[in-house]
């Protein structure tokens, strides 16, 4: 089985929200088709951080579902962001926004969210969740409070910022520990469980999550905006983060579909592995 994968689309930075919804939808679908044009797998995996707008995420999923037998996705931190007062009124809190996305995506017959769930597809076990991080030490919490936008745009009713992070981390961990005796073929998370050895940055507890075990053959993740594949302790890790337009040498203007040569290192396309 061939599996195409991608994460950290941040599509609203490439195709920003437009009061002209018809134009916004058309451009969004066009850039998705550009992104997946090199795909050749049966399954597409999207490891979170679609956009700050659910409607745009649904267009991404709908367009991808036209070309794949199965689309699996989990959510990222940006998929919880509430940027405006109207979003806060509409969703109440960040989990309200997530639940709205899950409910609407459920209408797409070959699209399946992996959010604290497992599913067997053609004999292969897929599992996934955001796998929320837990900042550690003064340095980790200072980064969360002073640098990370998560502390500004994620709202959980009944929790302050610190307790909200702890609660999301605990929910991820409680579920993950139930998989100890499950052999997983493909695990999908937004936050990686290991530090990327190709990363130019020092390890940061807001960009990875410690797990008690890893029993997946393949692990697709993102969050750190890097594109890399590496093996560690018998697991193959796959990262294909698209990230923001300004991360690319050939900075494409917003609302313009990227050409083939976008960067001397990064690519704007899917990557594939086989199981």
Swiss-Prot record:
GO MF annotation list: hydrolase activity
Signal sequence region: none
Pfam families: Metallophos
Coiled-coil intervals, chain numbering: none
Origin: domain of life: Bacteria
Disulfide bridge partners, by residue number: none
InterPro entries (UniProt xref): Calcineurin-like_PHP_ApaH (IPR004843), Metallo-depent_PP-like (IPR029052), Pantetheine_PDE (IPR052963)
PANTHER family: [ACYL-CARRIER-PROTEIN] PHOSPHODIESTERASE PPTH, PTHR36492
Name recorded for this polypeptide: SPbeta prophage-derived uncharacterized protein YotB
């Amino acid at each position: 089985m061939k599996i195409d994968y991608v994460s950290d689309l941040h599509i609203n930075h490439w195709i920003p929200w437009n009061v002209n919804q018809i134009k916004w939808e058309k451009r969004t679908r066009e850039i998705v088709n550009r992104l997946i044009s090199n795909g050749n797998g049966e399954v597409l995996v999207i490891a979170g951080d679609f956009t700050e707008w659910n409607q745009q995420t649904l267009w991404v999923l709908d367009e991808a579902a036209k070309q794949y037998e199965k689309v699996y996705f989990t959510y990222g931190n940006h998929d919880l962001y509430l940027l405006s007062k109207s979003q806060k009124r509409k969703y109440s809190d960040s989990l309200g926004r997530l639940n709205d996305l899950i409910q609407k995506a459920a209408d797409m017959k070959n699209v399946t969210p992996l959010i604290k769930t497992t599913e067997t597809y053609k004999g292969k076990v897929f599992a996934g969740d955001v796998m929320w991080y837990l900042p550690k030490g003064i340095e980790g919490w200072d980064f969360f409070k002073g640098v990370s936008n998560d502390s500004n745009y994620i709202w959980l009713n009944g929790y302050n910022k610190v307790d909200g992070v702890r609660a999301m981390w605990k929910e991820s961990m409680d579920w993950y520990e139930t998989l100890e005796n499950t052999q997983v073929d493909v695990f999908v998370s937004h936050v990686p469980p290991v530090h990327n050895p190709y990363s130019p940055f020092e390890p940061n507890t807001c960009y990875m999550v410690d797990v008690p075990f890893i029993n997946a053959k393949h692990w697709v993740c993102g969050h750190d905006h890097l594109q890399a594949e590496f093996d560690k302790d018998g697991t193959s890790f796959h990262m294909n983060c698209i990230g923001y337009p300004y991360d690319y040498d050939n900075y494409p203007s917003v609302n313009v579909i990227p050409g083939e040569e976008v960067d001397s290192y990064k690519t704007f396309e899917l990557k594939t592995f086989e199981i």
